[in-house]
């Protein structure tokens, strides 16, 4: 048998081995995407592609359709957690670190069939922060484009371990949310139903030309108020890193920032100083 035939057979077998975990997810508006069983009673799918639904239908490999509730969402990591009745499944081991040019199999599900493709890993980079402030443990992209139905698909390493979940990058390339990032989000969503975000408690406006953010308002009782920030202060640094826009501040108020103490570089009346602030949890509602 040729190398290509061996590779083809191995990829098909791998997709078949994990098929029982792969589901199709259909929102109330009819849009369809993929997901996978994380553990008994829990399915992971792509948060943004799911849309603003409170419940969804989940289609399993045997054709069974089950109503699911949205147990929680984390837009910052693009993870949505669905709660429903599922069979017992073994824990899905996370893959070891993947390498550029290694292979992975993307496995999703349509209404009547499994959807799978073999892809190379085109990029592996360091941890990064999403546009919504989420801490993503590695930048992994695949050399394939996603369809709407394969958003939320599982990305599987050759040994059957889970690389992560496929979501769409700006050019519809498959960007992978790593299994370790998903595990962190699932733990928090299972416990709280949401992912807490850091809270500073200020209204900010850009100063211009990437030179900081000026404080236009301070909420009573907020971490900023307790630390002594005042209207008119210009925040120039955050833990020593330059603040170039209001978005720089917002993105740093991620899930892991709650109860952390940060040092802000501040200009007040032309004088520079440092102010320590212990961040709170952003109020909900």
Q: What do these predicted regions represent?
A:
Residues 19-21, 80-91, 115-172, 179, ...:
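Active-site region of chymotrypsin-like
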Residues 55, 161, 181, 223, ...:
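Residue-level recognition of oxygen-bearing side chains
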Residues 8-11, 15, 118, 179-186, ...:
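Extracytoplasmic/secreted envelope proteins and their assembly/folding machinery
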Residues 31, 141, 145, 188-252, ...:
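PDZ/PDZ-like groove recognition
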Residues 2-3, 22-115, 139-140, 148-149, ...:
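Conserved active-site neighborhood of the chymotrypsin/trypsin-like protease fold
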Residues 40-43, 157-163, 232:
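Short, glycine-anchored, charge-dense loop/turn motifs used at functional sites
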Residues 38-39, 157-158, 239, 268:
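A cytosolic small-molecule/anion-sensing beta-strand core signal
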Residues 1-5, 103, 116, 158, ...:
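Interdomain regulatory linker/hinge segments that flank or connect interaction modules
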